[in-house]
Amino acid sequence: MLTLASKLKRDDGLKGSRTAATASDSTRRVSVRDKLLVKEVAELEANLPCTCKVHFPDPNKLHCFQLTVTPDEGYYQGGKFQFETEVPDAYNMVPPKVKCLTKIWHPNITETGEICLSLLREHSIDGTGWAPTRTLKDVVWGLNSLFTDLLNFDDPLNIEAAEHHLRDKEDFRNKVDDYIKRYAR
């Protein structure tokens, strides 16, 4: 699956040889991001939560992938939520960009797909934002946890959803179920 990994190995074997000098720029120049991603994707695939699946539309572009989260407990159980992740060139100094593609009624995800997850913030006052020591595995586990233990009604991005939960938990659950039936199957 990791065709980029085989390219990197091939390029490492060419270093120092005359062939490397004549190789095209595209085979000689591999970004720091891409080298990191080869290792991180392998680690991610080996440690993926059972409620998550990762899909790489183009195995040569590890910096663009889709994540499917299928919660097995809580309000969102039975739903199938799609996320799109793009890892910028400046990775790992900056976090990946993640968007929820599935319309959802959630206090930490807007209906347009914006996500409130501290580790996706480039700068954070409390120190819980992105750091170069974080990996894609942290991002995936964090997104997965937004449906369970990181579900946060006290610091919402979607204030309307949080207030709805505070006002009427049963009606909130009904709206979540309705969104799952309409958008998350």
UniProtKB/Swiss-Prot annotation:
Key words, A-Z: Acetylation, ATP-binding, Nucleotide-binding, Transferase, Ubl conjugation pathway
Modification note: The acetylation of Met-1 increases affinity for DCUN1D3 by about 2 orders of magnitude and is crucial for NEDD8 transfer to cullins.
Residue numbers spanned by region Interaction with UBA3: 1-29
GO cellular-component term (any): nucleus
EC identifiers of the protein: 2.3.2.34
Family: Belongs to the ubiquitin-conjugating enzyme family. UBE2F subfamily.
Gene responsible for this protein: UBE2F
Gene Ontology biological process terms in this record: post-translational protein modification; protein neddylation
Described purpose of this protein according to its UniProt entry: Accepts the ubiquitin-like protein NEDD8 from the UBA3-NAE1 E1 complex and catalyzes its covalent attachment to other proteins. Together with the E3 ubiquitin ligase RNF7/RBX2, specifically neddylates cullin-5 (CUL5). Does not neddylate CUL1, CUL2, CUL3, CUL4A or CUL4B. Mediates neddylation of the CUL9-RBX1 complex.
Identification of the protein by name: NEDD8-conjugating enzyme UBE2F
Tissue: Widely expressed (at protein level).
Record organism: Homo sapiens
GO molecular-function term, one example from the UniProt record: ATP binding
Modified residues (N-acetylmethionine): M1
Pathway linked to the protein: Protein modification; protein neddylation
Active site, UniProt feature: C116 (glycyl thioester intermediate)
Swiss-Prot/TrEMBL catalytic activity: [E1 NEDD8-activating enzyme]-S-[NEDD8 protein]-yl-L-cysteine + [E2 NEDD8-conjugating enzyme]-L-cysteine = [E1 NEDD8-activating enzyme]-L-cysteine + [E2 NEDD8-conjugating enzyme]-S-[NEDD8-protein]-yl-L-cysteine
Domain UBC core: 32-185
Record's subunit section: Interacts with UBA3 and RBX2. Interacts (N-terminally acetylated form) with (via DCUN1 domain) DCUN1D1, DCUN1D2, DCUN1D3, DCUN1D4 and DCUN1D5.
Keyword match tRNA-binding: no
